[in-house]
Amino acid sequence: MKPEETGGSVYQPLDESRHVQRGVLQALGAIQILNGILILALGIFLVCLQHVSHHFRHFFFFTFYTGYPLWGAVFFISSGSLTVAAGRNPTRMLMQNSFGINIASTTIAFVGTVFLSVHLAFNTQAFKGCQSSPSPDVCISLGSSSDGLVSLMLILTLLELSVTISISAMWCLGNVCGLREAITSPPNSVESGILPEGSDSENLNTQPQASEE
């Protein structure tokens, strides 16, 4: 289908799709921020339980001492904030920074998934010692609470993993992966989405594209 020219530009008919892409990026970024906040909150609950249950700290030690709820949440909130910013104003710098930190967050989410899975596996073994503990009921209750919090954290981490992969893929489809080559050797403006000199900055490609800084 041949795009119609509007105001002397062939980019105008693509505006609606471009705005949809920006909206999707901002929504995914908001999910990342919410995930980070919830993971941090669950981590705080784990810390509180760990301090209350002096005799049953083995239920909490793995996630607590790895610090995943803290540094994982920081990465997720940061990547979400950059994604929202890049969705609102897709400059080259914001796009590259968002792409880079989302790749890092994908790695962090994968590592967090491993940590939390190991924690749940360890708790399964720790439950077997509850019957021989001084307070079996308290032991089982704390173990169940720990499992519940860690399971929620694991679900949020898996959601974060899927979101970061989706955002990274969107940036790659928007030519961010080859953006450095595009800067040194300007490609066809319609294919890459990088605006030709003198064109209106509002008329961008269907993918989340960079505006001239």
UniProtKB/Swiss-Prot annotation:
It is a multi-pass membrane protein. InterPro entries: CD20-like, MS4A. This is Membrane-spanning 4-domains subfamily A member 3. The keyword Zinc-finger does not apply. Belongs to the MS4A family. The C-terminal region is required for binding to CDKN3-CDK2 complexes and the modulation of CDKN3 activity. Keywords: Membrane, Receptor, Transmembrane, Transmembrane helix. Pfam families: CD20. Residues 48-58, 119-148 are extracellular. It comes from the Eukaryota. It is found in: Membrane. Residues 1-26, 80-97, 170-213 are cytoplasmic. Expressed at low levels only in specific immune tissues, such as, spleen, bone marrow and peripheral blood leukocytes. The chain crosses the membrane at residues 27-47, 59-79, 98-118, 149-169. Residues 189-213 are annotated as: Disordered. Residues 201-213 have a biased composition (Polar residues). Hematopoietic modulator for the G1-S cell cycle transition. Modulates the level of phosphorylation of cyclin-dependent kinase 2 (CDK2) through its direct binding to cyclin-dependent kinase inhibitor 3 (CDKN3/KAP). Interacts with CDKN3. Interacts with CDKN3-CDK2 complexes through its binding to CDKN3; this interaction facilitates dissociation of cyclin A from CDKN3-CDK2 complexes. One of its GO terms (cellular component) is cytoplasm.
